[in-house]
Amino acid sequence: MIGILLLIGICVAVTVAILYTLYNKIKNPQNPNPSPNLNSPPPETRNTKFVNNLEKDHISSLYNLVKSSA
């Protein structure tokens, strides 16, 4: 009997926690554009630098491949 009540209590607690989380997400949506951290560059800059680096490496390796095969 105590085990059943404990199980029901756990199920109710989990259900309430899930509903509370969903309610807070709907009521207070996260800001899609958070204020930038002044100590780090914005993510776009870091991603662009990374992609540009890969692009340069890729182009130079293709150039070396064509140059060596000719």
Curated annotation (Swiss-Prot):
Keywords: Late protein, Membrane, Transmembrane, Transmembrane helix, Virion
PTM info: Phosphorylated by a OPG054-independent mechanism.
Principal location listed in the UniProt entry: virion
Topological type in the membrane: Single-pass membrane protein
Pro residues bias (residue ranges): 31-44
Similarity-based family: Belongs to the orthopoxvirus OPG139 family.
Protein name: Virion membrane protein OPG139
Species whose genome carries this gene: Monkeypox virus
